């Protein structure tokens, strides 16, 4: 069949997707696709909670006035190795998803997450170093699976959705992170409270050895292990998802199979006389001049905004300790037992997430197809810049003992809110909408990997930068830095740069994927609309 007929058949299939009414399968796909992000957020949230417990269990120093803590290089490895794995997985599975198809590799990422979550909890060794080494090994591969879920889930959801509610559906997949955060916090609270009641222990200051009961070693393992359950429960449905019609029609060049796959899960009228396509019309590659001309600046925009956003977003834990100590939520470590400390940290961070982090996700879901991606991202970057400057300029006013705690807490929560009702959501959504189908997962993976590089810089680069310039006031094992206040000024600058790079990213609200990517550029007239079955 000739190329023109093939393009017409492609467009009939794609137009049917664009005008399909919202159906039950869309919501099923959100849950199935979102489980990877649930696991991602659960793991990232919980590992930050249990690191202090790991320090008490494995790095106690006899005679020390304060509990054991993970050495800086060990803490960086335990927390950061999953980021490195995620970055690698985003690039690898993004490329593989375009090469082999979304469906063929989608189950692999979830199985990696399930198995490595369980294996992380079973980390073993005769010495603290060997336990941490095995934990880091499994956390790398956990991150690798999580990384693969970024481009695949975003691409699959964008290619299943209609153009009217596509943004909300992709945002809802990403918003599963909110459920992961809250679930992680609740699990940590319940497990630590249960063990605390079953195995009472004195504060560290009273009895350093007895303050960490032997059973505490089970606590962090149970918390990490339970994160695998929701993902495992959705594995069957993930393997049953058909290949997306857009991949089959535009990349595999089989419009007939695309129509058949679509009819299995979405109720649309059977299309007329559709056969196989004659071939792909514009087979330019990622490194071609044509791609650079048409999408080069778009890729720079999506990658740079995600990079800058994650530098700022993941660095916000720098001043959590100031908030928690200032408002009295977490007393000094020596006045608590190991399980009491875990309970209090989990409770405080869960409350922050519940009030500041999670609502922003769902504001994005509700408004992204009304307001548009560009406005939400630009306003989010602007507000984050404003709030960080407001925190930085009178920083000593906010952190002075005995006052100003409510204002500091409010600004901190609003910064998280406008990150999630802003660029943290839109940087995930837009790369799945604006690139050609045959490069969509690859470009999303590149953008996401740029973001994860920013997360590494934000989490660890600024952890060193934010140390006090006075060596006597730095945390144990860290060299002097530029201080939290100056770090906040740098982060405000990152947000401002993110706002500027946002202007390189096109608005995709209400437009078809083919219109945004140019996949159907040669076809000036769309086929007559196909009516969906009610």
From Swiss-Prot:
Broad class of where this protein is predominantly found: membrane
Coiled coil among keywords: no
Topological domains annotated Cytoplasmic: 1-29, 97-104, 149-168, 238-294, 372-375, 427-445, 508-534
Keywords carried by this UniProt record: Membrane, Phosphate transport, Symport, Transmembrane, Transmembrane helix, Transport
Single GO BP term: phosphate ion transport
GO MF, one annotated term: symporter activity
Keyword set includes Phosphoprotein: no
Extracellular side stretches: 51-75, 126-127, 190-216, 316-350, 397-405, 467-486
Record membrane topology: Multi-pass membrane protein
Segments for region (Disordered): 514-534
Membrane spanning stretches: 30-50, 76-96, 105-125, 128-148, 169-189, 217-237, 295-315, 351-371, 376-396, 406-426, 446-466, 487-507
CDD domains named in the record: MFS_PhT
GO cellular component, one term: membrane
UniProt function note: High-affinity transporter for external inorganic phosphate (Pi). Probably involved in Pi uptake, translocation and internal transport throughout the plant.
Family: Belongs to the major facilitator superfamily. Phosphate:H(+) symporter (TC 2.A.1.9) family.
Further comment found in the protein's record: Although related to the sugar transporter family, it does not transport sugars.
Name the UniProt record assigns to this protein: Inorganic phosphate transporter 1-6
Organism: Oryza sativa subsp. japonica
Source taxonomy: Eukaryota, Viridiplantae, Streptophyta, Embryophyta, Tracheophyta
Gene: PHT1-6
């Amino acid at each position: 069949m000739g190329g023109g007929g093939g393009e017409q058949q492609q467009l009939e299939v794609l137009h049917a997707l664009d005008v399909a009414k919202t159906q039950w399968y869309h919501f099923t796909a959100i849950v199935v696709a979102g489980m990877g992000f649930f696991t991602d957020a659960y793991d990232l949230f919980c590992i930050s909670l249990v690191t202090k417990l790991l320090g008490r269990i494995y790095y106690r120093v006899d005679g020390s006035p304060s509990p054991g803590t993970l050495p800086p290089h060990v803490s960086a490895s335990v927390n950061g190795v999953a980021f490195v794995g995620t970055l690698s997985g985003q690039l690898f599975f993004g490329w593989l998803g375009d090469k082999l198809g979304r469906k063929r590799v989608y189950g692999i990422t979830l199985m990696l997450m399930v198995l490595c979550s369980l294996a992380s909890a079973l980390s073993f060794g005769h010495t603290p170093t060997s336990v941490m080494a095995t934990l880091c090994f499994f956390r790398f591969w956990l991150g690798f699976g999580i990384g693969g879920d970024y481009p695949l889930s975003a691409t699959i959801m964008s290619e299943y959705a209609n153009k009217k509610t596509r943004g909300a559906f992709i945002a809802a997949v990403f918003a599963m992170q909110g459920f992961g955060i809250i679930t992680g916090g609740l699990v940590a609270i319940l497990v630590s409270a249960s063990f605390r009641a079953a195995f009472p222990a004195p504060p560290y200051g009273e009895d350093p050895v007895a303050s960490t009961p032997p059973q505490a070693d089970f606590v962090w393992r149970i918390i990490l292990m339970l994160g695998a359950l929701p993902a495992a429960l959705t594995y069957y449905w993930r393997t049953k998802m058909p290949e997306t019609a857009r991949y089959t029609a535009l990349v595999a060049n089989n419009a007939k199979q695309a129509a058949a796959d679509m009819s299995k899960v979405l109720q649309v009228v059977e299309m007329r006389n559709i056969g196989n396509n004659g071939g792909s019309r514009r087979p330019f590659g990622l490194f071609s001049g044509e791609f650079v001309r048409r999408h080069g600046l778009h890729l720079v925009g999506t990658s740079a905004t995600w990079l800058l956003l994650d530098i700022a977003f993941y660095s916000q834990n720098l001043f959590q300790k100031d908030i928690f100590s200032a408002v009295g939520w977490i007393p000094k470590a020596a006045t608590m037992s190991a399980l009491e400390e875990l309970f209090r940290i989990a409770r405080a961070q869960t409350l922050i997430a519940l009030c500041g982090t999670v609502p922003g996700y769902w504001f994005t879901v509700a408004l992204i197809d009304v307001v548009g991606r560009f406005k939400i991202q630009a306003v989010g970057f602007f507000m984050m810049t404003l709030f960080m400057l407001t925190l930085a300029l009178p920083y000593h006013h906010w952190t002075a003992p005995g006052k100003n705690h409510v204002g500091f807490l409010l600004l901190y929560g609003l910064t998280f809110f406008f990150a999630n009702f802003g660029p943290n959501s839109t940087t995930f959504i837009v790369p799945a909408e604006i690139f050609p189908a045959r490069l969509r997962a690859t470009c999303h993976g590149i953008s996401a990997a740029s973001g994860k590089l920013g997360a590494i810089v934000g989490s660890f680069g600024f952890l060193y930068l934010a140390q006090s310039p006075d060596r006597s006031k730095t945390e144990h094992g860290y060299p002097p830095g530029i201080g939290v206040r100056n770090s906040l000024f740098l982060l405000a600058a990152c947000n401002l740069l993110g706002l500027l790079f946002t202007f390189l990213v096109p608005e995709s609200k209400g437009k078809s994927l083919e219109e945004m990517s140019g996949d159907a550029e040669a076809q000036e007239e769309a086929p007559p609309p196909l009516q969906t079955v009610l």
